[in-house]
UniProtKB/Swiss-Prot annotation:
Changing residue 142 to A: Loss of NCAM1 polysialylation activity. Loss of autopolysialylation. Loss of NCAM1 polysialylation activity. Loss of autopolysialylation. It is found in: Golgi apparatus membrane; Secreted. It comes from Homo sapiens (Human). GO terms for cellular component: extracellular region; Golgi apparatus; Golgi membrane. It catalyses: [N-acetyl-alpha-D-neuraminosyl-(2->8)](n) + CMP-N-acetyl-beta-neuraminate = [N-acetyl-alpha-D-neuraminosyl-(2->8)](n+1) + CMP + H(+). Residues 21-359 are lumenal. The chain crosses the membrane at residues 8-20. Keywords: Disulfide bond, Glycoprotein, Glycosyltransferase, Golgi apparatus, Membrane, Secreted, Signal-anchor, Transferase, Transmembrane, Transmembrane helix. It is a single-pass type II membrane protein. GO terms for biological process: ganglioside biosynthetic process; N-glycan processing; nervous system development; oligosaccharide metabolic process; protein glycosylation; protein modification process; sialylation. InterPro entries: Glyco_trans_29, Glycosyltr_29_Sialyltrsf, GT29-like_sf, Sialyl_trans. This is CMP-N-acetylneuraminate-poly-alpha-2,8-sialyltransferase.
Length: 359
């Protein structure tokens, strides 16, 4: 009996020690993670990261402090962020590989699947730019346009088009949504999966004609195709390349460098933003810091409802569903959004999530 009481006493003491030690570690981590990194760059606390859904439930609370009126650019912070990002990547160089990087027949490993390889085809090589499409380019104001349904009824079209340089994601349609999203497109990303999702995998001539028509609207804009990320989209990339060449489209193709995504992730991880893989929107913002003096973001809203509880579509142009908080997702969009919101509040960028003021 005495031995049983002794074991219970030891067990109870052990549990208490574990409990208090855990609390001590949690307090230490919370203190460390709320500190700022470097010379004023951002860091997010774990409590903020874990309370993503509160942004919807507590509209107007301190969880989400966001004010567009009275926003002012913090030029010194913009320069500081640009300088620090340059320690990890140079967007002018890493935005695209160039012809001299490869020759037809070269074999490369996919960036996110090193076991799989890709052969550089003649079509792909012929479409590689001679020099970086962003070489020596600089703009006073840039718009990075995401695809969230938060753009619907925003009336942001004219404001977006007023910027010197407009970046759009995933070849999103613009003409039928011009009042809300504008039409100006200087730099457009296109994941290979878009071919299947938006253009039927080019199964018939009408799908191909629809795609060619969409690209013809871009004129000499930059079409940015992440061709070297993962196995599975290579046939779509080749079909796109073949159609561009066959129809002699003026669009300027670009294919991101093999180091870009890891360099971008490295920058954010260093600043205590624990992303798994940067979303296209975060990638574009990071690149834009190199050649834009003032960056405005639109269509960034990774939540199923707005602050008034109204349903928000994942994309403004389709009915695709997305689980923002799923651990299976390669992205951490709510965390990215909060990071961008912190930067907005500090004047490093302007994040518009509501209606635009008529100019």
């Amino acid at each position: 009996m005495r031995s049983i009481r002794k074991r219970w006493t030891i067990c109870t003491i052990s549990l208490l020690l574990i409990f208090y030690k855990t609390k001590e570690i949690a307090r230490t981590e919370e203190h460390q993670e709320t500190q700022l990194i470097g010379d004023g760059e951002l860091s997010l606390s774990r409590s903020l990261v874990n309370s993503s859904d509160k942004i919807i439930r507590k509209a107007g609370s301190s969880i989400f402090q966001h004010n567009v009126e009275g926003w002012k650019i913090n030029s010194s912070l913009v320069l500081e962020i640009r300088k620090n990002i340059l320690r990890f990547l140079d967007a002018e160089r890493d935005v695209s590989v160039v012809k001299s990087s490869f020759k037809p027949g070269d074999v490369i490993h996919y960036v996110l699947d090193r076991r799989r390889t890709l052969n550089i085809s003649h079509d792909l090589h012929s479409l590689l730019p001679e020099v970086s499409p962003m070489k020596n380019r600089r703009f006073k104001t840039c718009a990075v346009v995401g695809n969230s349904g938060i753009l619907l009824d925003s009336e942001c079209g004219k404001e977006i088009d007023s910027h010197n340089f407009v970046i759009r994601c995933n070849l999103a349609p613009v003409v039928e949504f011009a009042a809300d999203v504008g039409t100006k497109s200087d730099f457009i990303t296109m994941n290979p999966s878009v071919v299947q999702r938006a253009f039927g995998g080019f199964r018939n001539e009408s799908d191909r004609e629809k795609f060619v028509h969409r690209l013809s609207m871009l004129n000499d804009s930059v079409l940015w195709i992440p061709a070297f990320m993962v196995k599975g989209g290579e046939k779509h990339v080749e079909w796109v390349n073949a159609l561009i060449l066959k129809n002699k489209l003026k669009v300027r193709t670009a294919y991101p460098s093999l180091r870009l995504i890891h360099a971008v992730r490295g920058y954010w991880l260093t600043n205590k933003v624990p992303i798994k893989r940067p979303s296209t929107g975060l990638l574009m913002y990071t690149l834009a810091t190199r050649f834009c003096d003032e960056i405005h973001l639109y269509g960034f809203w990774p939540f199923p409802k707005d602050l008034n509880g109204k349903a928000v579509k994942y994309h403004y142009y389709d009915d695709l569903k997305y689980r923002y908080f799923s651990n299976a997702s390669p992205h951490r969009m709510p965390l990215e959004f909060k990071t961008l919101n912190v930067l907005h509040n500090r004047g490093a960028l302007k994040l518009t999530t509501g209606k635009c003021v008529k100019q």
